[in-house]
Amino acid sequence: MKNNLRYGIRKHKLGAASVFLGTMIVVGMGQDKEAAASEQKTTTVEENGNSATDNKTSETQTTATNVNHIEETQSYNATVTEQPSNATQVTTEEAPKAVQAPQTAQPANVETVKEEEKPQVKETTQPQDNSGNQRQVDLTPKKVTQNQGTETQVEVAQPRTASESKPRVTRSADVAEAKEASDVSEVKGTDVTSKVTVESGSIEAPQGNKVEPHAGQRVVLKYKLKFADGLKRGDYFDFTLSNNVNTYGVSTARKVPEIKNGSVVMATGEILGNGNIRYTFTNEIEHKVEVTANLEINLFIDPKTVQSNGEQKITSKLNGEETEKTIPVVYNPGVSNSYTNVNGSIETFNKESNKFTHIAYIKPMNGNQSNTVSVTGTLTEGSNLAGGQPTVKVYEYLGKKDELPQSVYANTSDTNKFKDVTKEMNGKLSVQDNGSYSLNLDKLDKTYVIHYTGEYLQGSDQVNFRTELYGYPERAYKSYYVYGGYRLTWDNGLVLYSNKADGNGKNGQIIQDNDFEYKEDTAKGTMSGQYDAKQIIETEENQDNTPLDIDYHTAIDGEGGYVDGYIETIEETDSSAIDIDYHTAVDSEVGHVGGYTESSEESNPIDFEESTHENSKHHADVVEYEEDTNPGGGQVTTESNLVEFDEESTKGIVTGAVSDHTTIEDTKEYTTESNLIELVDELPEEHGQAQGPIEEITENNHHISHSGLGTENGHGNYGVIEEIEENSHVDIKSELGYEGGQNSGNQSFEEDTEEDKPKYEQGGNIVDIDFDSVPQIHGQNKGDQSFEEDTEKDKPKYEHGGNIIDIDFDSVPQIHGFNKHNEIIEEDTNKDKPNYQFGGHNSVDFEEDTLPKVSGQNEGQQTIEEDTTPPTPPTPEVPSEPETPMPPTPEVPSEPETPTPPTPEVPSEPETPTPPTPEVPSEPETPTPPTPEVPSEPETPTPPTPEVPAEPGKPVPPAKEEPKKPSKPVEQGKVVTPVIEINEKVKAVAPTKKAQSKKSELPETGGEESTNKGMLFGGLFSILGLALLRRNKKNNKA
C-alpha cells in the first residue's frame, strides 16, 4: 500500500510536472517570439546605430540626428553626416562608446563601412510626399524618426571582437585627404648633375666690357647643356655661382624661373643658398631622350659683396666645369657739387606687399660745410595717401668718408660704423602719411645715411622716390652773408610693366633664347617635338609641322622719354599666354640724357644705366620694371636709378627642332630659310551683290590681282586676291564669295602668265596649281561678264611647306550649292578653252577632269564633330513608375496573418528569387535581423532592379507579407514598392551569434518557425503529463 502510494505519488508528481512543463514550454515559446523580436531590434540599434539615415536633400552638408524609440529598450542618438546628392561617402562624426542592449554583454564598437554602388533592399513604411526621388530605408518596427532625402547613404556598424575596447570610426574624408596627401608627396629623385654635359658656357656683359650695377646692368650666364637619357620626375642638377653675383637684384623674391616647353613646365628652379641653383625635372621629362637645353640666366652684382669699383671675377661651376669672366664694375657716384654729395638706391622691392626700402647718402664734400640744410624724401609717383607712415631711420656714419660703400649699401647693424641718431633728430625729423619725410639740419658737417621703409599705392603703375637737398654753403667771412643756396635732386624710380609688348607692338633685338630640345621616346622610333607652333595670344599650345624658334623682345631699342634716366626692370611671370622667351630690356639708351635702363625679373637680361651729370642740380636715374609679357600692352610703371630688380632671372623654353615662326596678334609671319611669306587669308564674309570690275596689275614681275566671285546665291561682295611676288616674298590675300545662285554685276575671270603666276605657300611646300576652267555655275548670271586669260607663264603657283608643287587642273569643282572656300580660279591659254555664254540665264560649258564634284553647302572652313557616345537611356524615369501600379497594396492588410505560418516556404517560393525578393528582408516585422542577410540577396536582384518597375504586379504578393506597417500607407492612399537603389550595402553581424542563427533569422517567420516546434514539443509534454495523471488516477482507484 505504501509502495503503491509512493508509486502513485511519484506518478502524480511526474504527471503534474509534465503538464506544468509542457504548459510553460507552450507559453514560453509563444513569448519567445516577442522576446526574440525585441532583442533583435535592440541589437540592431546597437549595431546599426540608427539603422539608416535618409536626409532630406540639401545642397550643402547637413547633419541629421535620428532617434529610434523601440518600446522599452534603450535608444541613443547618432550624428550622421551626409554629403549632397552626388556624394558617395557618409562619415560618422562620433561613435557611441557605451550602448547597452538587452541580452548583450559587450559594448558595440562601431566601424563605418563604405560600399559603393551596391544594391540594398528598401521598403518605405511611411507616406512619401516627393515620390519622384524619395527613397527611404525602414529597419525599425515601431516609432522611427527619419529624414527623407534624394540620396540615401547608410552607415552600417559591424561589431568587433571583445578585445577591442574603443570604438573605431573610419572617416572616408580623412582617407581621401590622406590619399591626396600621398599623391602630392614629393617624389625624391636623384642628382643627375654628373650626367649633364656642358657643350658650351659663357658669361657675357650685354652693355660692353663693363658693368654699371646702378644703371641696372648685369651679366648673362649662357649654357648649352646636354642630358643623358632616362631622366625621371624628381631628378635634379645643380650649379654654383660665385658670391659676387645673384639672380634677383633688388627683388625680395628669391626664386629662379621655370624651364618650360611652351606652357608645360619641364623643370622648376630654386635657390639653395651660397650661390647654389637647382633645377628639378617634372614628370613631363618622362620618356624624353636626347634632351638639350640652352639657358640664359641674368646675374646681378651683389652690392653687399662688391662695395666698390673694380674688376670682379664671375664664375659658374657645373659638373666640375667652370665658366668664368673678369669684368670691371663701376658704380654711380650720385649727384654732387663742391659742397655736398647726394646718392641713393632702392635697396629692396616687394611687389606682393607693395613695400620697398631706400638708402640715401648725405655727405659734405671737400671739407666744406653747409648751413640750414633741409633733406626731403618724397614719393612723386605711386604715393599712398591712405597708407601708414613710413619708417625713417637716420644714421651717422662713423667711418672714413672714403670707406662708405660706393655700392650704396649700409649695414646699419654694424655699430662701429653706423650710429643711430634718429632720437637725436627729435623735432628735426618729420614723417607724413603720404610717405614723405623731411630732415632739417642746422649744419651739415657729418655724413648721414637715411634708411627709408615705406609703401606705394597698390595698383600704381609707376613708383618714383625723390631725395632732395636744399642748403647754403658756409662762408668764411660772416659779413658777406649775401649768397645763393643750392639744391641737389636724386630720383630713384621703378617702372612697372604688365609684361606686355610695347604699345607699338615692335620687336627689338633678341637677347635671350632659352631652348629645351628633346625627342619623344614613346613610339617604335623617336618622335621629335615641341609645344610651340603658332603661339598667338589666344593659343598657348599648338602643333605645327614647321620647326619654330620663337623669341619675343618687347623693348624698343633706343626708346626713351625720361631726361633723368629710368631703369627698366622686367618681371617675367607665368601669367603670359605665350610662354616663350621675352626680352624687354632696352639695348641702347639713345635719346636719353639720363638713359633708360631695364632690369629683368625672370630670365631676361636687364639693362641698367644711370646718368652721372655733374653739371645738373637735378639728377635722377629711374629703374623701369616689367612684370608680365603678354603682347599688346605697354609701359606701366617707373622706377629710377640703379635698381637691379630681377625676381626670375631665367626663362627656360623648350624648342625641339622648331621655329623661325613669330606670330603677333592676327599677323602671321612665316620664315622659311630666307623666304618671308606673309599670309592674310581672312576677309569679310561676302554678302550682297558682286559688282564692279576686277583689276589686274602687273608691275616689274610683281603680280597683283584683285579677283573674286560674288555671292551667286543672293548678295555677295567679291573677295580680293592679292598676289605679290618679289624676291621670294609672297603676300597673299584671297577669298571668294558664295557660288551657286544669282550673280549680278560685272565680273571677270583672270589668268596670269607662267612667270607672274602667284605662289601659294602652305607650310614649307610650294604648290603650283593650274586651272583650265572655272566652275560651272548653276543659276542665273546677270550683267556683263568677261573672262581674261594670260599666258602659261602667269599661271599661279601654290606653295605648300618648303616644296613647290605644280598641279594642273583641267577644271575646278562643279559647285551646286554654296561654297565659301577661299578659292582662286585661274585659266590657262589652252586650245580647248571652254566656251562661255553670258546674259540672262546663260549657261557656261567647260570640262572638268581632275577635281571632285562638290555639292551641298560649304561655308568657310568647317569642322564636323560627331559625338560617338550614345545617349544614356532614361533609366532614372523607370523607377518612378512602379509606385503607380501598386494599387493592389490595399489587399495587404486583409491577409496579414496568413503569410506567417507558411513562412518556412517563403525562401523556396519562386516569388523570393524574383525581383520582389528584396522585399523579404525589409519586412517591418523583423527588418533588423534580416539586415545582415540583405547583402546576400540583393546581389542577385541587382540585375533585375530595372525589371521591378517594369513588372509592378509581381511585387504585390510579397507586399502581403507586410502584416502591420503596410496598413499605414494604405490609409494614406499611397502605395510604396521596394526600390533596390541604395549605393551602400548594409551589413550587421551580431557579436555572439553564428551565421546559422542569422540564417534562421533571415525571414520574418524565422522566429515563428522555432515557435511552432516548441509548441508541438510542449503539447506532447502536456499530453504525456495528462496521460500519466489519468493513469495515476486509475492506479489510485485500483
UniProtKB/Swiss-Prot annotation:
Q: Where is this region: Disordered?
A: 37-193, 736-804, 825-976, 989-1015
Record's keyword terms, sorted: Cell adhesion, Cell wall, Peptidoglycan-anchor, Repeat, Secreted, Signal, Virulence
Fibrinogen/elastin/tropoelastin-binding as annotated region, ranges? 189-507
Motif YSIRK-G/S signaling motif boundaries: 7-18
Q: Where is the composition biased (Basic and acidic residues)?
A: 112-121, 174-189, 825-834
| GO annotation, cellular component aspect | extracellular region
**Protein name per Swiss-Prot or TrEMBL:** Fibronectin-binding protein A
State the species of origin: Staphylococcus aureus (strain Mu3 / ATCC 700698)
